[in-house]
């Protein structure tokens, strides 16, 4: 991608995520690393991570098949604590809930970290996201930004690539039933 410099902090993981088919560019030559990630985009990444092939859409939205799959697998749930909007930018905590639900669907054991006291913004974490945040931090999938997790901030495409690769690298291989290898 012409907009991913070889010395960028995310260069290697963007390359890995692209090669693994988890993430694509916004065009053949652009990745747009600083752009926000929508609900539909993250669900499509998880759909691909589960070894699903994206069908040619003849009607509806490009993401309908992936969103239907995510609802069927309880990755998107009415119990998530917020109303999923495929076209809205995700916050980091919303992404963590969706990724947590995906990893649970894949059969991975995720034990929660006892506390998040090392993060100065822990009080910003919504109640609905607390277990997911604790579990993903405890598993090392989410590392935060120094002393902050920025749960209410939007998520960039570069950050998403890092998180997806961390998830791929940290899952229990014996629990895999597909793409997260």
Protein language model features and the residues they cover:
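Feature responds to low-complexity, polar/acidic, surface-exposed segments characteristic
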Residues: 1-11, 24-93, 99-130, 143-154, ...
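Short, compositionally biased
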Residues: 11-20
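Tandem repeat domain/solenoid detector
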Residues: 19-21, 138-140
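Catalytic cores of secreted/periplasmic or lumenal enzymes
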Residues: 133
């Amino acid at each position: 991608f012409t907009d991913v410099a070889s010395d960028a902090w995310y260069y290697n993981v963007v390359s890995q995520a692209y090669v693994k088919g988890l993430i694509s560019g916004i065009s053949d030559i652009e990745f747009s690393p600083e752009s926000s990630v929508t609900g539909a985009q993250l669900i499509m990444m998880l759909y691909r991570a589960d070894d699903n092939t994206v069908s040619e859409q003849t009607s509806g939205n490009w993401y309908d098949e992936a969103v239907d799959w995510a609802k069927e697998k309880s990755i998107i749930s009415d119990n998530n604590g917020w109303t999923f909007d495929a076209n809205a930018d995700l916050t980091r905590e919303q992404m963590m809930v969706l990724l947590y639900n995906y990893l649970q669907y894949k059969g991975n054991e995720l034990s929660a970290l006892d506390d998040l006291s090392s993060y100065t913004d822990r009080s910003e974490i919504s109640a609905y996201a607390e277990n997911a945040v604790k579990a993903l931090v405890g598993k090392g999938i989410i590392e935060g930004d120094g002393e902050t997790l920025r749960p209410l901030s939007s998520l960039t495409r570069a950050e998403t690539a890092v998180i997806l690769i961390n998830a791929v690298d940290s899952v229990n291989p014996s629990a895999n039933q597909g793409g997260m290898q």
